[in-house]
From Swiss-Prot:
Keywords: Electron transport, Membrane, Photosynthesis, Plastid, Transmembrane, Transmembrane helix, Transport. The lineage of its organism: Eukaryota, Viridiplantae, Streptophyta, Embryophyta, Tracheophyta. GO terms for molecular function: electron transporter, transferring electrons within cytochrome b6/f complex of photosystem II activity. This is Cytochrome b6-f complex subunit 5. The chain crosses the membrane at residues 5-25. Pfam families: PetG (PF02529). It is a single-pass membrane protein. The keyword Nucleotide-binding does not apply.
Length: 37
């Protein structure tokens, strides 16, 4: 029961973590573009 609960939390956190990484990478990329100007 506890293992299934932890598995659900992990599966829920993985997409959030990936989205956070993509957002930070995108913001750094745009910031670099602005600095190039």
């Amino acid at each position: 029961m506890i293992e299934a609960f932890l598995l659900g939390i992990i599966l829920g956190l993985i997409p959030i973590t990936l989205i956070g990484l993509f957002v930070t990478a995108y913001l750094q990329y745009r910031r670099g573009d602005q600095l190039d100007f």
